[in-house]
Structure formats: C-alpha cells, structure tokens
Amino acid sequence: MIIIDTGCANLSSVKFAFDRLNIKAEISRDIATIKSADKLLLPGVGTAMAAMKILQDRNLIETIQNATQPMLGICLGMQLMTEYSSEGNVPTLSLMSGHTDLIPNTGLPLPHMGWNKVRYEQDHPLFAGIEQDSHFYFVHSYAVLPNEHTIATSDYGVPFSAALGCKNFYGVQFHPERSGKNGAQLLKNFVENL
C-alpha cells in the first residue's frame, strides 16, 4: 500500500490509520514505487488548485491517471478524481466523469464539519460489514453531486456523493482515518476486498 505524497496535512493520520490495522503503508512520491504498489491511496486536504499544482510539480499526474491498481481517494483526493473543480476553476485528474462544486446554499454553515450518515446505494465491497446509515466524519465545503459513479450518499441540505467508484478508482468524501470503527472497516475493506 502506497499513500501518494500529495504534500497535504493528513498524510500522517492516514498512515497511522493503517498502522492501527497492522497494514503496512508507506508514504511516497517516487514514481517507480507508486507504479509497483499493489494499492494506492490519494489523500487530500486543502484546495483543488493547490493540490493539482503539487501533483504537477511532482510529475505525478500521468502516473495517477495511468494507474491500474485499486486507488482510494480521500476527501479532496476523491474530488480530484473527477474532471473539474469549481474551487479555483481547475481541471482535475479526469479518472471518472463528474465535477466538484461548492455545496449549494441551503442555510447550513460551510464547511460541512462533523459526523453525518452515509447511505450506500449498492452492495459495494467498500462498505462490507458496515451498517447502512452509519456515521462518518466530514470536513468539506465542496462536493460532487450524485452521478452515475456514486456508490454512497450523504445529505447536508442537499444530497451529495459520499463515495464514488469507477473501474479501479474509488473515492470517499469523508475522512475514514477520523471515522472510528466504520472508517477502519472501510480502509480494511479497500485493502482486502478491492
């Protein structure tokens, strides 16, 4: 398992989440290491524009786009998997269709921060052993509205994609590394089931 070094703040907490599961995970930006990994994790905290610049500066965009092994994007990492983000009006990785937009104003404060229910729409291996409507921890102001790649939703005034999946690419808007036993189970499922 390689955690792609995106330079974001949650790298260590993601690695510690795997350590707690006794799953060997290494943080790397080395292209050869990333290409040879059995699984990849794309973490992200911050803005889409800054994250894409870091990926470009580290020559990682093409490597990520050409990955054939299972990859899990977390929070901004999931958003980067789509085609475009209105956060900075930046093209993203285009690993699946869809775009990321500011959560529509429904009178609720932004960012959406805290625990929220997740309802998975399909019997997906990423959610094996996790009860329907389980709570996960979110911190975000931008989201991907439900589309053909949505495998789970949550609601913050409007429904949004809590998880996406397309081919070997998966993403979660919430932070599994901060979501207790449900998050730990999801990370374990990613490693063991995908």
Curated annotation (Swiss-Prot):
User: Where in the cell?
Assistant: Cytoplasm
Alphabetically ordered keywords of this record: Amino-acid biosynthesis, Cytoplasm, Glutamine amidotransferase, Histidine biosynthesis, Hydrolase, Lyase
The signal peptide, as residue positions, is none
Check the record and name the Pfam families matching this protein. GATase
Q: Which BP terms in the Gene Ontology apply to this protein?
A: L-histidine biosynthetic process
Pathway in which the depicted protein is active: Amino-acid biosynthesis; L-histidine biosynthesis; L-histidine from 5-phospho-alpha-D-ribose 1-diphosphate: step 5/9
What are the EC numbers?
4.3.2.10, 3.5.1.2
So what does this thing catalyse? Answer: 5-[(5-phospho-1-deoxy-D-ribulos-1-ylimino)methylamino]-1-(5-phospho-beta-D-ribosyl)imidazole-4-carboxamide + L-glutamine = D-erythro-1-(imidazol-4-yl)glycerol 3-phosphate + 5-amino-1-(5-phospho-beta-D-ribosyl)imidazole-4-carboxamide + L-glutamate + H(+); L-glutamine + H2O = L-glutamate + NH4(+)
GO MF entries: glutaminase activity; imidazoleglycerol-phosphate synthase activity; lyase activity
The record's section on NCBIfam families has: IMP_synth_hisH
Q: Which PANTHER family would you find in this protein's record? A: IMIDAZOLE GLYCEROL PHOSPHATE SYNTHASE SUBUNIT HISH
The annotated subunit structure for this chain is: Heterodimer of HisH and HisF.
- According to UniProt, the name of this protein is Imidazole glycerol phosphate synthase subunit HisH
The organism named in the record is Mannheimia succiniciproducens (strain KCTC 0769BP / MBEL55E)
